[in-house]
A protein has these predicted regions:
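Cap/insert and terminal regions of metallo-dependent hydrolase folds
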Residues: 170, 180-269
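Active-site metal-binding motif and surrounding structural segment of the metallo-beta-lactamase
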Residues: 43-93
Length: 274
């Protein structure tokens, strides 16, 4: 793994049904800690990790937001590779809510070989989280929160990351998951340095993609939310893929109608320096 600063590497930026890009998941890194957040919907996670020079042996922390197929099935592949990786040292810590834990454990118990399951027992530690739990991942301090989804139990998180400036004040990253913001979680997000938010499509394209009928939001909504909550930087993800050619430009423009901070609409494999 190359030497890095505090950064996010977007392994995927698409929604559940994309085929030209990968499902939304990312690597959050400081100079001394790496955490994978979700893993997409299959073994495509292995290709994405390889493309950004992250080895399975580098991954010791994995946060899973929820148990939808496009977030959790790639986790099974990561766990399988940890189990069969001869050079793997230490433990893989997997964090998620009770539904996430049940789904992962059920699948691996049903499909992994006995030899692999024995290695899972040795190398993988499952941490079942409750709403509001605080925990440390290396030099990151995390607090998870229930996003109050009506479709599937899902946790976002607030992360305090070491800052590179002289103030020593931590950088705050808020990851909202892939459904609309709930006011109940304001305290986790307000004033954050960085906010990661889903934008299923442009508001201008709402009649085509039906985001509100699917419990999703738009780039316009994300921009309004970022401005209201006083965050400094906005990262949009979990998008449709039919407008990829102009996605970065158009999503940025729409979010900027209301948000005056910096806006990032990353492509797959793009690195964002925090």
């Amino acid at each position: 793994m190359d030497k890095i600063t505090t950064q996010i590497t977007m392994l995927g930026t698409g929604n559940a049904t994309v085929s030209q890009i990968y499902n939304t998941c990312f690597v959050l890194q400081t100079p001394s800690t790496l955490m994978l957040v979700d893993a997409g919907g299959g073994n495509g996670i292995l290709a994405q990790l390889k493309k950004v020079n992250v080895q399975i042996s580098d991954i010791h922390h994995l946060f899973v937001t929820h148990a939808h197929t496009d977030h959790v099935l790639g986790v099974i592949w990561v766990i399988r590779m940890v189990a069969q990786c001869n050079g793997y040292e230490g433990l893989l810590h997997v964090y998620g809510n009770d539904k996430v834990m049940k789904v992962i454990k059920t699948i691996i118990d049903m499909i992994l070989a006995k030899k692999q399951l024995a290695k899972v027992a040795e190398r993988v530690v499952f941490h079942q989280l409750e709403d509001g739990d605080c925990f440390e991942v290396g030099d990151m301090k995390l607090e998870c929160f229930d996003i109050q989804s009506t479709k599937e139990k899902q946790f976002g998180f607030r992360a305090e990351l070491p800052s590179s400036d002289e103030s020593g004040k931590p950088l705050v990253l808020a990851c909202l998951g892939d459904e609309p913001y709930n006011e109940q979680n304001r305290r986790y997000i307000v004033g954050a340095d960085w906010m990661m938010c889903e934008a299923f499509c442009l508001y201008a394209d709402r009649d085509t993609f039906k985001p509100y009928e699917k419990c999703h939001s738009t780039a316009l909504d994300a921009g309004k939310l970022a401005e209201e909550l006083g965050v400094k930087n906005l990262i949009l993800n979990h998008t449709e893929e039919k407008t990829l050619a102009n996605r970065k430009e158009n999503y940025t423009r729409e979010a900027a109608e209301n948000f005056k901070g910096r806006i990032f609409v990353p492509d797959d494999l793009e690195v964002i320096e925090l």
